[in-house]
Amino acid sequence: MYCCSAQDSKMDYKRRFLLGGSKQKVQQHQQYPMPELGRALSAPLASTATTAPLGSLTAAGSCHHAMPHTTPIADIQQGISKYLDALNVFCRASTFLTDLFSTVFRNSHYSKAATQLKDVQEHVMEAASRLTSAIKPEIAKMLMELSAGAANFTDQKEFSLQDIEVLGRCFLTVVQVHFQFLTHALQKVQPVAHSCFAEVIVPEKKNSGSGGGLSGMGHTPEVEEAVRSWRGAAEATSRLRERGCDGCLAGIEVQQLFCSQSAAIPEHQLKELNIKIDSALQAYKIALESLGHCEYAMKAGFHLNPKAIEASLQGCCSEAEAQQTGRRQTPPQPMQCELPTVPVQIGSHFLKGVSFNESAADNLKLKTHTMLQLMKEAGCYNGITSRDDFPVTEVLNQVCPSTWRGACKTAVQLLFGQAGLVVVDTAQIENKEAYAPQISLEGSRIVVQVPSTWCLKEDPATMSLLQRSLDPEKTLGLVDVLYTAVLDLNRWRAGREQALPCIQIQLQREICDFGNQADLPSGNGNKSSGGLQKTFSKLTSRFTKKASCTSSSSSTNYSIQNTPSKNIFIAGCSEEKAKMPGNIDTRLQSILNIGNFPRTTDPSQSAQNSSNTVANGFLMERRENFLHGDDGKDEKGMNLPTDQEMQEVIDFLSGFNMGQSHQGSPLVTRHNSAATAMVTEQKAGAMQPQQPSLPVPPPPRAPQAGAHTPLTPQPGLAPQQQSPKQQQPQVQYYQHLLQPIGPQQPPPQPRAPGKWVHGSSQQPAQAVGAGLSPLGQWPGISDLSSDLYSLGLVSSYMDNVMSEVLGQKPQGPRNNTWPNRDQSDGVFGMLGEILPFDPAVGSDPEFARYVAGVSQAMQQKRQAQHGRRPGNPRGNWPPMDDAHRTWPFPEFFTEGDGLHGGWSGAQGDSASSSDETSSANGDSLFSMFSGPDLVAAVKQRRKHSSGEQDTSTLPSPPLLTTVEDVNQDNKTKTWPPKAPWQHPSPLPSTLPSPSAPLYAVTSPGSQWNDTMQMLQSPVWAATNDCSAAAFSYVQTPPQPPPPPAHKAAPKGFKAFPGKGERRPAYLPQY
């Protein structure tokens, strides 16, 4: 149209431009093939405005070459027309080409890339068409502003200044069009191109590119939405990261200060910094409480935009961790390494993790086959022949921890973390199976759901710089997380990308570290209201009616301060969890524990409590009964050791049969018994009853664990359930949190557990869960020999001797009798009623009295010596001690009330784990050697090893003895002092006296107490209420106090409900 002159055309510029009116259009078409292509491509496209003008404009584009007489204006008009046409032709050509490719790649791994590119090209083409059709009238209007005759000017000198300005506006308009088109096209095409390269070229993705993995995509709209969700999450909880008046986060300020100063920080400045951190922590807690029951959701895929997630995490965690988050690499084949160890629900089939007598390959094969069958049910294989294993691998990779753990942790950090002050850690899960991932089929979609629970803790780096004691069990809050990945088989078949996994987060409302009775969710610890709560609860409780009982307990009982059970609650929680590992959701357990039920994790109990409430009620009642029964027994007098038992003690002390002790190392026995208990809910049930009586002490610790354990213990539980091997590393990883993991409870771990009420209770439980596996699995095992020696080999030896005397051989090299002996002594009356009576214990009342007196005297002496000895017992367990050295141990036992409550909790645990395991600890060993305690210890060990819950509670008497009795005994009685067990006075009332060991007779306990004290540091007793719970961590002394709490506990033995899972830590237990 611009080939002809203005006169020739007799048309104004506007009409000519719009019509593309060139008289020589036809000739030009022949000269330029491009317009032909343009017309061909535009036909199907038919954007009316664009097609005609564009085609004609393109044709005219070449016209000035053909025409001998051309002018600058005509050339410019023609050039603009050709340019706009070219944009449309280019877009149509590229769309047409990608469409051709995509039809060829239908079932290959290139199809996804071709389809993505085609979609983007169509979008760009439509945008270009709208842009060019809108710009042409604008250009025409501008050209009409040229001066008269400008179209015929041939020399630039002829153009007026106004003409130059008009042409300048045309130029800028064209530049703008050019820029907008290229920018828009790049924005749309670049991410798809990167995705294509990632899917098709990168070797790891070559074979899975067409499958549209659940997580592989570039900066597509899906990723952009994910980035928005990350930013939104961090902003939603920004009040948790309030900066000081200096604009800096308190924790970061402290860390930077210490890094920048080479000289020691002066005392006064250290004090100021501590005050600042206290203030920041208080503000954080208040802000956390103000968040309410909000549920949060965000997309995963943090590795797809490292810079965005790093920016979003500012203030939520350290800079180094933020950088690592986006660069976190998933192992190329996590399935082969991790899947065998992961219990998983596939459809209606629940497949456990690999067991010690099964090969990982067989386990993997079974899970893969089951997954394949589920997909075949969906008919996903119709027409699919190549790579039909891809969806199986893709889905199963989603349940591997390396795939979801990092994402879940990052999500929790985004919401609840504060750099330098609050860190996110895995909650200890003892019942790994309750948290098993679930893969289900919903139409053509395969849905993978992975529940997990995380805990918010004070940043240990900052706290250690400020020389603050840190309680590993203290948590600021618990967070439930549900990771959901969906693989749409139709999308996969079509080669389209899958949606990114979704992460749903909800803050648990039970924050018990301050001793507050935070309202824990009833049921599984999942919020009862809200979709996430229901889903999470459903997932985590599906394996366990037992588990439910735990949660119910949490809801029923929250008076941590008021009830021993509460104190126990912290310790008990973990213990119970440990015991329930097989059946109960860790969180549920913690909650139950919190609820103050000595949810002795014995599977049977959980099984019994199909309804949380019932379970709780059962636990509570049971505990009371046990306690009462025990008390009754105490009143009557404990069953005294028989001559045979005494002979055993003598043999033990004389070194006779020392070899056996090793064989029957308490660790192993307990482990097995625990495992057995876990495995057989029935056993657990039986144990539970025992536990309840013993639980009197255990309950307290259970609750404690509940409060804190849910966080830390859960991981422990999970490891337990997973497998001994897994358990070991996990235990080590969370050792400071759940040192008392059940399996670890064996001597080495037991000591550590002793510190942690949690741990100890957990340990028994873990032992149960993991106890199935060989001792070697236990993290504590490494220190087993030292533990045995530390314990003086006494504990294990005594266990062996006892088992032999009782006719119960140690279960195995590592099957110490302790763990197994369901020491019902702690259970006292209840155990007596439930379990066969041990003739050896009660046959000679006079002898029993003598032993009791000796035991009491010894304990009193110990109390005097170690009353508050913070770390002695711990000292015996190097792992524990070191782990918790930070805390002031003595403090733990200074609080009489808390102590005694804690003791209950801790004791139960410690009794079961710490005492047994490391009863050899100084006092324990000492008391053991000293006479009645020793006899009692032997006897109890025996019982434990036998796994029967004897009613006799000789060793326990000290625990049960009320402080008064103990004091009285100490003051007025010597050898014959009243057997502690004989004293019915409830320890709880007397226990409070801080000076008196919680259990006069339980000097071993007091040792443990000391340990606990060490643990008690403020951290331990996140709450004063929980201080007892903190004690429970100590677990050695816990036994005695618990009995006081429940009265039944007077015996000081925790019933080892889980067949030794929770062996009462009767004071002398070693």
Swiss-Prot record:
Say where the protein is mainly found.
Answer: cytoplasm
Q: Which GO terms describe its cellular component?
A: cytosol; P-body
Coiled coil location: none
Function, as annotated: Acts as an effector of RAC1. Associates with CCR4-NOT complex which is one of the major cellular mRNA deadenylases and is linked to various cellular processes including bulk mRNA degradation, miRNA-mediated repression, translational repression during translational initiation and general transcription regulation. May also play a role in miRNA silencing machinery.
Location in the cell reads: Cytoplasm, P-body
Bias kind Pro residues: ranges: 692-702, 977-992
Q: Tell me the Gene Ontology biological-process terms attached to this UniProt entry.
A: Rac protein signal transduction
Name of the featured protein: Granule associated Rac and RHOG effector protein 1
InterPro entries per UniProt: DUF4745, GARRE1
Gene Ontology molecular-function annotations: CCR4-NOT complex binding; small GTPase binding
Question: What residue spans carry the region label Disordered?
Answer: 681-771, 855-992, 1032-1070
What keywords does the record list, in alphabetical order? Answer: Cytoplasm, Phosphoprotein
Q: Which domain of life is it from?
A: Eukaryota
Location of Phosphoserine modifications? S723
Q: Where is the composition biased (Low complexity)?
A: 719-742, 906-924, 951-962, 1046-1058
What is the protein's quaternary organization? Interacts with AGO2 and TNRC6A.
Q: Name one Pfam family in it.
A: DUF4745
